[in-house]
Amino acid sequence: MSETQNHNSYGKPVEMTVIGAGSYGTSLAISLARNGANIVLWGHDAEHMARLDADRANHEFLPGIAFPDTLIVETDLQKAVQASRDLLVVVPSHVFGIVLKSLQPHLRADSRICWATKGLEPETGRLLQDVAHDVLGDSYPLAVLSGPTFAKELAMGMPTAISVASPDAQFVRDLQEKIHCSKTFRVYANSDFIGMQLGGAVKNVIAIGAGMSDGIGFGANARTALITRGLAEMSRLGAALGAQPETFMGMAGLGDLVLTCTDNQSRNRRFGLALGQGKDVDTAQTDIGQVVEGYRNTKEVWMLAKRMGVEMPIVEQIYQVLYQGKDARLAAQDLLARDKKMER
């Protein structure tokens, strides 16, 4: 009997436990289970999880996509955490620390934690690795999974490529082996733990700006300029934090940025579109119907940039629109009116 079997109560080895049963967490669980691996999916809402188990589908977020037989729906957190050595945390960034605290009492001695959460710590703008270290100490290997991924396309088995990074090289290799488990889901290894976390947060903010630009009606030229200069801002902040420049030309940087800024499956882009069309922040968020990570990310990235002394004019203007009531058109005008300078 394997080590995994000794720890779980399912009578069969569990390859991975996914913590978080929203659209992205569910899609990752489906993708992992589709190739025959036993995958546990845990969510905090017992009624929601009961529907998932009864329907063998997540009709709320991923209608029409059936669960593989090897996907195990679980409501008992202790059973879920102890079922597998490897945990994949897929929750909104503002509850990331809370969720880790709930996991901590149930962790195995050999547990390893990867997250696909994109964002920074609320109110501080700290990287999620710092939150994880505060909660868990240095006892467990940590990793981050990031890249251009829409939940529906992943769950449907459409071709997707992402990256995984960790200070623990063996953990990266193991995750790459476990997640890169089909002909349509490719996983690249990355050594830049900091850059991988940062890209996922900043791209959400720039996507709001791209949506605002399109909502106003500025067109493709303006959208492309925002993406390009947004990448420059992401890279400057990354350099200040010690990230590797090439990370931002990869899946977790340019890849995720282009995806989120150009396709209306992106909640952040749709949120920006609504703002550009004149809706207020509260109405725009309500109309989306799901968490708009970029709203909180904007404040977090803005705080981090201020703390690091990094100039991020696009982030600055989006922050003023979201948190200070500035008109989106005026924000665009102020960006265009900035002093002439060298491109860098």
Curated annotation (Swiss-Prot):
GO CC annotations on file: cytosol
Domain of life: Bacteria
Enzyme Commission numbers on file: 1.1.1.94
Binding residues annotated for sn-glycerol 3-phosphate, in chain numbering: K118, G147, T149, K203, D256, S266, R267, N268
GO molecular function, a single term: NAD binding
Binding site for NADPH: S23, Y24, H44, K118, A151, R267, V291, E293
Record has Transmembrane as a keyword: no
Catalysed conversion reaction: sn-glycerol 3-phosphate + NAD(+) = dihydroxyacetone phosphate + NADH + H(+); sn-glycerol 3-phosphate + NADP(+) = dihydroxyacetone phosphate + NADPH + H(+)
Top EC class, one word: oxidoreductase
Cell compartment(s), UniProt: Cytoplasm
InterPro entries: 6-PGluconate_DH-like_C_sf, 6PGD_dom2, G3P_DH_NAD-dep, G3P_DH_NAD-dep_C, G3P_DH_NAD-dep_N, NAD(P)-bd_dom_sf
Active site residues of this protein: K203
Keywords noted in UniProt: Cytoplasm, Lipid biosynthesis, Lipid metabolism, NAD, NADP, Nucleotide-binding, Oxidoreductase, Phospholipid biosynthesis, Phospholipid metabolism
SUPFAM superfamilies named among the record's database cross-references: 6-phosphogluconate dehydrogenase C-terminal domain-like, NAD(P)-binding Rossmann-fold domains
A single GO BP: glycerol-3-phosphate biosynthetic process
Keyword Endoplasmic reticulum: no
Any single Pfam family the record assigns to this protein: NAD_Gly3P_dh_C
Pathway involvement of the protein, from the record: Membrane lipid metabolism; glycerophospholipid metabolism
Family: Belongs to the NAD-dependent glycerol-3-phosphate dehydrogenase family.
Task of the protein: Catalyzes the reduction of the glycolytic intermediate dihydroxyacetone phosphate (DHAP) to sn-glycerol 3-phosphate (G3P), the key precursor for phospholipid synthesis.
Protein name as annotated: Glycerol-3-phosphate dehydrogenase [NAD(P)+]
Naturally occurring in which organism (per UniProt): Vibrio cholerae serotype O1 (strain ATCC 39315 / El Tor Inaba N16961)
